[in-house]
């Protein structure tokens, strides 16, 4: 079976709050072959404790919530087989999926608030 490339455009935003906060995306687009592991990177900067979120927007559909980290276990399981790992020392919250599907082609949004 031939593998089709999966394109994902990662976009980032911050939820407004009183303190300085930001998210950064080192890659504008991620391309993986179907069946390969997928990682969409997100790093953040906050002055307090972070609340981190991932959202997805599939073609011709509205924004959908995938997962969030507020406190507790650093590995967060989300919808559609996605998970994200909170790493405080590296200030990262990378979205991962062990085996990407063509249907995963979408816009992915990382968000932070403190």
Swiss-Prot record:
Gene: TRAV3
Protein name (record): T cell receptor alpha variable 3
Residue span, Ig-like domain: 21-114
InterPro entries tied to this protein: Ig-like_dom, Ig-like_dom_sf, Ig-like_fold, Ig_V-set, TCR_variable_region
Disulfide bonds: 42-110
SUPFAM superfamilies: Immunoglobulin (SSF48726)
Keywords of this entry: Adaptive immunity, Cell membrane, Disulfide bond, Glycoprotein, Immunity, Immunoglobulin domain, Membrane, Receptor, Signal, T cell receptor
Pfam families xref list: V-set
Entry's localization field: Cell membrane
Protein function: V region of the variable domain of T cell receptor (TR) alpha chain that participates in the antigen recognition. Alpha-beta T cell receptors are antigen specific receptors which are essential to the immune response and are present on the cell surface of T lymphocytes. Recognize peptide-major histocompatibility (MH) (pMH) complexes that are displayed by antigen presenting cells (APC), a prerequisite for efficient T cell adaptive immunity against pathogens.
Organism: Homo sapiens (Human)
């Amino acid at each position: 079976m031939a593998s089709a490339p999966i394109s994902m455009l990662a976009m980032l935003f911050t939820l407004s709050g009183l303190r300085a906060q930001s998210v950064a995306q080192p890659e504008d687009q991620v391309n993986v072959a179907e069946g390969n592991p997928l990682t969409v990177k997100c790093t953040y900067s906050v002055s307090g404790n972070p609340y981190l979120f991932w959202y997805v927007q599939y073609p011709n559909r509205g924004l959908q919530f995938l997962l969030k980290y507020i406190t507790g276990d650093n590995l967060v399981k989300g919808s559609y087989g996605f998970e994200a790992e909170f790493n405080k020392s590296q200030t990262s919250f990378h979205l991962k999926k062990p085996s990407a599907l063509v249907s995963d082609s979408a816009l992915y949004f990382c968000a932070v608030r403190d």
